[in-house]
Amino acid sequence: GHSHTELREAIIVNGRTQSNVEKALTELRRDLSSADLVGLAADNGTAGGCATTLSTWPQVDILVNNLGIYEAIGFFDETDGAWQKMFEINIMSGVRLARQYLKGMLERGHGRIVFISSESGISPAPEMAHYSATKTMQLGIARSLAELTRGTKVTVNSVLPGPTRTDGVEKFIQDVFPGLTQAEAECRFIAENRPTSLIGRLIDPREIGDIVAFVCSARASVINGSCIRAEGGLVRTIC
């Protein structure tokens, strides 16, 4: 999101492939011409990819664990392999990176870690039981790590977005509602699949970026061990 420029840090842009990284850098540089952007191609959904990332950048001041996959599939069709793949990518990627980066942050006495979870972490989706389970687990991991930061200026939090207009979500919605325009498909998706949403639309990725940027800033020093909901009010609970 654009707000990351307020942090005045070098931003490492990670992706699974070099082409994806270059595409992201091109888009970001168009909007963030003054930002210090560095690309890193490594598949952090694997142990080898995380090792590449950690050896290339042994320490960071801010870690945003945004890597994740999802798929809509009935519980009885979710194989052991599907569960294991979801766990390896959605959970172990963040665990492997945080294990090294958090240690360095604690030694230096400052830092930020943010896990990008999901509203499915507190409102599990029956058509994505394995995905929802990993998103719930992220909340527990983040809170456990936050307990290790006592007496430092390090914070560990989770942000829980609702349905967000990413490339993957747009394709998913078009596959579910073929023959409709993108706008029509999005409206239909919200009406039929997320009817409790108070905003009644998909979330712009920049809106999530703004929240993450604030949580990573010095102004958010009192926010630690928290689950920050950014799901447009679709979860009907008070806390």
Which residue stretches match the model-derived regions?
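Substrate-binding pocket helix/loop in short-chain dehydrogenase/reductase
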Residues: 74-76, 82-87, 193
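Active-site loop immediately N-terminal to the catalytic Tyr-X3-Lys motif
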Residues: 76, 125-129, 151-152, 200, ...
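Active-site helix of classical SDR
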Residues: 98, 134, 142
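Alpha-helical segment proximal to the catalytic Tyr-Lys
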Residues: 103, 147-148, 221
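Residue(s) in the substrate-gating loop at a strand-loop-helix junction
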Residues: 118
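Short C-terminal tail/terminal secondary-structure segment
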Residues: 123, 212-213, 224-239
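Short, small/polar-rich loop/turn modules that mediate ligand/substrate recognition or access, typified
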Residues: 150, 155, 223-225
